Structure formats: structure tokens, C-alpha cells
Regions:
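Acidic, Ser/Pro/Thr-rich low-complexity regulatory regions
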Residues: 1-77
Length: 77
């Protein structure tokens, strides 16, 4: 069974993984994959009622900021 506690652990693992691949400047494809994994898991947690609207939005927009800030830095050298 998926409990809120187990879901939080899984979300944290995915968030840390996304942060790591972005911070360590892995390939753009790998960063995009990690971002997609994390944001997809956020949406699943929201759909299952584990996250409320506000918490989903907060985490999603933070992930979006991290990913797109890194992508902009990568493009601008």
C-alpha cells in the first residue's frame, strides 16, 4: 500500500536525484528525464490525494524553477 509517509520518501528520493543531476551538470536529456520523473510523481501523489493543491503547486513550481534556471545557465554558457 502507498502511505503518505512512503510517498514522501519516494518524492524526496526523486527530488534529490533531480537536484543532483542538475547540480552535477549531467546531460540535458538526463536532467529532463529526472525532472519528468519527479514532476510526474508529484502529479501522481496529487491525483491519489496524498498532496493537496497548494503543496503540489509549491513543489511543482520549485522543480520548474530549478530545472529551467539550470537550462538557462546551460544555454548561456
Amino acid at each position: 500500500d502507498v502511505t503518505p509517509e512512503r510517498a514522501e520518501v519516494a518524492l524526496e528520493v526523486l527530488r534529490i536525484g533531480m537536484d543532483r543531476v542538475i547540480r552535477e551538470k549531467f546531460s540535458e536529456d538526463r536532467c529532463r528525464y529526472a525532472y519528468g520523473q519527479y514532476t510526474g510523481a508529484l502529479f501522481l501523489a496529487y491525483s491519489l490525494g496524498i498532496l493537496n493543491d497548494a503543496e503540489h503547486d509549491r513543489r511543482f513550481f520549485e522543480a520548474q524553477r530549478v530545472y529551467y534556471d539550470a537550462a538557462e545557465v546551460r544555454q548561456n554558457g
